[in-house]
């Protein structure tokens, strides 16, 4: 795949970026260079290579799944104008 001047201008217009003619011509070469590097990466054989999520091998620590109220209900409703038993009270809007 290659990028031409019309594509650069179209993308710049869609991104609402002001690009001069000289800048657009320079970007054509830069974008084609980037796409060349991406094409090289797609040629690498990665069969049997496990996907990496980190540079160092790590295992996520698991915690027990416990349901709690968070012990913060009073703090959460502290600034509410009207509450009842740690619930927000709001005016009725639907009859």
Curated annotation (Swiss-Prot):
Give the reactions, separated by semicolons, that this protein catalyses.
L-glutamyl-tRNA(Gln) + L-glutamine + ATP + H2O = L-glutaminyl-tRNA(Gln) + L-glutamate + ADP + phosphate + H(+); L-aspartyl-tRNA(Asn) + L-glutamine + ATP + H2O = L-asparaginyl-tRNA(Asn) + L-glutamate + ADP + phosphate + 2 H(+)
Keyword annotations of the record: ATP-binding, Ligase, Nucleotide-binding, Protein biosynthesis
The organism's place on the tree of life at top rank: Bacteria
First-level EC class: ligase
Matches recorded under Gene3D superfamilies: Glu-tRNAGln amidotransferase C subunit, N-terminal domain
**GO process terms (BP):** glutaminyl-tRNAGln biosynthesis via transamidation; regulation of translational fidelity; translation
EC numbers: 6.3.5.-
Single GO term (MF): asparaginyl-tRNA synthase (glutamine-hydrolyzing) activity
Q: Which NCBIfam families match?
A: gatC
Described by its record, this protein's role is as follows:
Allows the formation of correctly charged Asn-tRNA(Asn) or Gln-tRNA(Gln) through the transamidation of misacylated Asp-tRNA(Asn) or Glu-tRNA(Gln) in organisms which lack either or both of asparaginyl-tRNA or glutaminyl-tRNA synthetases. The reaction takes place in the presence of glutamine and ATP through an activated phospho-Asp-tRNA(Asn) or phospho-Glu-tRNA(Gln).
**Family designation:** Belongs to the GatC family.
Q: How does it assemble?
A: Heterotrimer of A, B and C subunits.
Q: What is this protein called?
A: Aspartyl/glutamyl-tRNA(Asn/Gln) amidotransferase subunit C
Q: Which organism is it from?
A: Rhizobium johnstonii (strain DSM 114642 / LMG 32736 / 3841) (Rhizobium leguminosarum bv. viciae)
Gene name per UniProt: gatC
